[in-house]
Amino acid sequence: MLEKLKGLSQKYAEIEYMLSQSEVWADAQKAAALSREKAELAPLMEAYARYETFRQEAESAEELLSDPEMKDLARETLSEARSGMERTAEELKINIGSVIPRSE
């Protein structure tokens, strides 16, 4: 799932880039299609960004576990980050089906 999300994230960035180009807006149909595609991907990409933030927080907290002075804070942060990752992963599983057909 994460590999598919990375691919969709790249696609989303490409769409954003294309929509920033004035030539795209010269073709109203193309601009509308890209805008629709961006709107469909936006909720999934927002959830993916939250997941990545939680993942990075967990990674940072794991590094701090070896520091005796930071151990308690690191455990708490790690627990919160992992919980956030689990919640967001469930949200991603639910929402990814609306973007990627089950056969993929």
Residue ranges and their predicted role:
Residues 1-104:
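Charged, heptad-repeat coiled-coil alpha-helices that serve as long linker/dimerization "arms"
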